[in-house]
Design a protein with these regions (language model features):
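Bacterial N-terminal signal peptides that target proteins for export
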Residues: 1-9
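Bacterial N-terminal signal peptides
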Residues: 8-16
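Sec/Tat signal peptide C-region and signal peptidase I cleavage site
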Residues: 17-21
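Low-complexity, Pro/Thr/Ser/Gly/Ala-rich linker/spacer regions in secreted
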Residues: 22-27, 359-386
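N-terminal structural segment of carbohydrate-active enzymes
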Residues: 24-114
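Extracellular glycoside hydrolase catalytic/binding regions
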Residues: 27-48, 67, 72, 79, ...
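Aromatic-lined substrate-binding rim segments of carbohydrate-active enzymes
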Residues: 82-155, 163-166, 208-209, 301-315
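C-terminal outer-membrane/trafficking sorting elements
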Residues: 379-462
Length: 462
């Protein structure tokens, strides 16, 4: 007889990883254990924000995480930190909550750099090594229980649609069931139309959604300075979990008001356009920002940096600082002579480390309220999203208790991320039982959605 049995939280967290990768278990309780999967939503005023699946979409539960962006994976002065030791050192010494893996993409991305005997070229010129660089960072982030952005670091991704789909399909298949992972499908579009970005993003997001409902980040025209371009013309996302990026460099860009050029929306400050997008209900994410000039140079202006930090904190905007590298640029965080186990900070690095010092020093794992039951069917409710409905197991069936009627989608996934059962229907309020006795022995993830409300449980059938 098959019995879904209770398993430990550490185990079930790891079970949703794809079988393509070794099971990865966190070595500590960090921000991912506390907040869960990052997800978009609106507050009671209709403002777009980022939330965590543990508390769900509600006022006061907005999530802001802050950390570092690795430099483009083309320079040996950067690759020292594309390592497990490099990520762990930044967690311990800088208190980062998130890291961004800015992967070079084009075959023509070749700056003649060499690291550990590898000629550094973009993904289209060296799929194996670039993919492995990203995997190393992702797995280090999971072990450290921090978030990780997988960044297709391109200025012309709309010309690389098939390559991006291939890459993100592999990443979603392998890591898409880890709450740590965020997919950034287009780093910085240049001066092209939003429609070109949107059409590209629609295709890549669809590829990701075959295997993962994790947060997706989408860039926008003029180097991610126009998230408001997407208002009323958002990308298509079956999981409704896409945010729009805002990039800024403190010496060059302004956080409020306008430049005074008298050119309509093009005149508005980058921060103003970000706020406009949020007020229209779009979630915004600062996946890259620098302390200096927009070209990466310059000495950080302390006052302008402080104003931008106040802007980000006011709007609960998550960010990754450019860059965790020893590149000879004013925005590089580390001095020459630093290593993956020992960091010596530049002016920029010390400034950013100061901001990161206010991140929490400890975290509490999301509560797993395991109900007492004489039934052999018991599992952990992993996503504590709201009080509108509850999900449990009883007598070989999934039990749904709902206080409201509405369209409800029930999905059960195996370890590969394949859908093993799916049901979508309009359920009235009250109790409903869904038979799962046909599932073979194995480990599964059950997810139940009513609109933006989510419950998720991980269980094992023996």
């Amino acid at each position: 007889m098959k019995h879904p049995l209770f398993t430990s939280l550490a185990l079930v967290t790891a079970l949703t990883a794809s079988a393509y990768a070794q099971t990865i278990t966190p070595t500590r309780v960090g921000p991912v254990s506390q907040y869960g999967q990052l997800m978009t939503g609106k507050n009671s005023q209709g403002k777009g924000q980022i939330y965590g699946s543990c508390e769900g979409v509600k006022d006061g539960a907005e999530v802001q995480v802050r950390g570092m962006s690795l430099y483009w994976s083309l320079m040996p002065e950067a690759m020292e930190f594309w390592t497990e030791e490099g990520i762990t050192t930044m967690v311990n010494d800088m208190n980062i909550q998130i890291v961004r893996a800015a992967m070079a993409t084009k075959a023509s991305d070749d700056w003649k750099g060499e690291w550990n005997g590898i000629q550094l070229k973009g993904w289209e010129g060296d799929k194996t090594n670039q993919t492995n660089f990203v995997k190393t960072v992702v797995e280090a982030a999971i072990k450290n229980d921090i978030y990780v952005i997988i960044d297709w670091h391109s200025h012309s991704a709309h010309e690389q649609t098939n390559s991006a789909k291939e890459f993100f399909t592999e990443m979603a298949k392998q890591y898409g069931q880890y709450d740590n992972v965020i997919f950034e499908v287009y780093n910085e579009p240049q001066q092209i139309q939003w429609s070109a970005v949107k059409n590209y993003a629609n295709e890549v997001i669809a590829a990701i959604r075959q295997y993962s409902d994790n947060l997706v980040l989408v860039g926008n025209p003029s180097w991610d300075q126009n998230p408001s371009d997407a208002i009323g013309n958002e990308v298509t996302d079956s999981k409704k979990n896409t945010a729009y990026t805002l990039h800024y460099y403190a010496n060059s860009h302004c956080w409020q008001g306008s430049y005074g050029w008298g050119d309509g929306n093009n005149d508005a400050c980058e921060g103003t356009k970000g706020e406009k997008a949020m007020n229209a209900g779009l979630s915004v994410f600062i996946s890259e920002w620098g302390t200096g000039n927009s070209d990466g140079g310059g000495t950080p202006d302390q006052s302008r940096n402080q104003s931008w930090q106040e802007y980000a904190n006011k709007h609960k905007l998550s960010w990754a600082n450019w860059s965790a590298s020893m590149i000879k640029e004013g925005t590089a965080a580390f001095q020459s002579g630093s290593s993956k186990t020992s960091l010596q900070y530049t002016t920029s690095g010390n400034l950013v480390k100061g901001y990161l010092s206010t991140n929490p020093k400890s975290y509490t794992a999301c509560k797993a309220n395991v109900p007492e039951s004489s039934s052999s069917v018991v599992a952990i409710p992993f996503f504590q999203n709201n009080d509108r409905f509850n999900v449990s197991f009883a007598n070989g069936k999934l039990a749904l208790e709902s206080t409201a009627s509405g369209t409800t989608k029930i999905e059960v996934f195996d370890l590969l991320g394949h859908t093993r059962m799916q049901k979508e229907d309009v359920f009235a309020s009250g109790s409903h039982m869904i038979d799962i006795s046909t599932l073979p022995a194995g480990r599964y993830l059950a997810r139940v959605r009513q609109g933006v409300n989510v419950r998720q449980l991980r269980f094992e059938v023996r």
